[in-house]
C-alpha cells in the first residue's frame, strides 16, 4: 500500500487540481500519470445540472465508440428459434431461455451485456432484482430489447457502451484503455461528449455541464474544459 501511495502522490504532483485542462492535455496526463501494472481502463465522468426526478430530464442511452473500448464484451442473449440461431451466428457468447434464467438465479454472472427479443421479456423480468442493480437489464432505450439481435450483438462486441444519469445527475462511461493512442482516446471522448450535448433536456436550466473529468483505473482524476470538446 505504501508503494502505491507513493506512486499516487507522484501522479498527483503532476496534476493541477484547480485547472480544467483541454481534452488533449487531459488525455496526455492520463497516460503520463498511469501507474497500474495492467492495461487500465479510461473513464470519463460528467456532472449534469438536471433533475432526474422529472421524466423529461432523465438521460439514458447507448452509442458505439469510433475506436471501441478495448474490452472484449461477453454477450448473453435471450432468444428462441431463428433469433437464437441469429444471435449465435453474430457471435453471442451465451444464448438461451429459461435455462439461463435458472443459471443466473443460481448466482452465475459471467457476462457483460444482456440482449433480449421482446417476446422474451416476460421471463427476463424475473431477473429484475439481479440484473437491475447491475445495470444489465435489457431496455429498448439502449437497443438491448430488439428483434435485430445480430446488429445488437455485433455492436456490443464492437465498442458499444451504455450510459445513464444517476440520481445526482452523474454520468460515467469507459472510453478506452490507457494503451490506446492519445488521438483515439480524444476521438472517443469527443464522440461521447457530442452525445451528452445532444442529450440535454430542453427543460434543463442553468449551466448544463457543471463538471467534466477523466481518470484511469487506480489513477488520478483530471478536470476537463468542456469547451475543448
Curated annotation (Swiss-Prot):
SUPFAM superfamilies: Ribosomal protein L1. One of its GO terms (molecular function) is tRNA binding. Keywords: Repressor, Ribonucleoprotein, Ribosomal protein, RNA-binding, rRNA-binding, Translation regulation, tRNA-binding. GO terms for biological process: regulation of translation; translation. GO terms for cellular component: large ribosomal subunit. Belongs to the universal ribosomal protein uL1 family. Binds directly to 23S rRNA. The L1 stalk is quite mobile in the ribosome, and is involved in E site tRNA release. NCBIfam families: rplA_bact. Part of the 50S ribosomal subunit. This is Large ribosomal subunit protein uL1.
Amino acid at each position: 500500500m505504501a508503494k502505491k501511495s507513493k506512486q499516487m502522490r507522484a501522479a498527483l504532483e503532476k496534476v493541477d487540481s484547480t485547472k480544467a485542462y483541454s481534452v488533449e492535455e487531459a488525455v496526455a496526463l492520463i497516460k503520463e500519470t498511469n501507474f497500474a501494472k495492467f492495461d487500465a481502463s479510461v473513464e470519463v465522468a460528467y456532472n449534469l445540472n438536471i433533475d432526474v426526478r422529472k421524466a423529461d430530464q432523465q438521460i439514458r442511452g447507448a452509442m458505439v465508440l469510433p475506436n471501441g473500448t478495448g474490452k472484449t464484451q461477453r454477450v448473453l442473449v435471450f432468444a428462441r428459434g431463428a433469433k437464437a440461431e441469429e444471435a449465435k451466428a453474430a457471435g453471442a457468447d451465451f444464448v438461451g431461455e429459461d435455462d439461463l434464467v435458472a443459471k443466473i438465479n443460481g448466482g452465475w454472472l459471467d457476462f457483460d451485456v444482456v440482449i433480449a427479443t421482446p417476446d422474451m421479456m416476460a421471463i427476463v423480468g424475473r431477473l429484475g432484482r439481479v440484473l437491475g442493480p447491475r445495470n444489465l437489464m435489457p431496455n429498448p432505450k439502449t437497443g438491448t430489447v430488439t428483434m435485430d439481435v445480430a446488429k445488437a450483438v455485433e455492436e456490443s462486441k464492437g465498442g458499444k457502451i451504455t450510459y445513464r444519469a444517476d440520481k445526482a445527475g452523474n454520468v460515467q462511461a469507459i472510453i478506452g484503455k490507457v494503451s490506446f493512442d492519445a488521438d483515439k482516446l480524444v476521438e472517443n471522448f469527443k464522440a461521447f461528449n457530442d452525445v451528452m450535448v445532444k442529450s440535454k433536456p430542453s427543460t434543463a436550466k442553468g449551466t448544463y455541464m457543471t463538471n467534466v473529468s477523466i481518470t484511469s483505473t487506480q489513477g488520478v482524476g483530471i478536470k476537463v474544459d468542456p469547451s475543448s470538446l
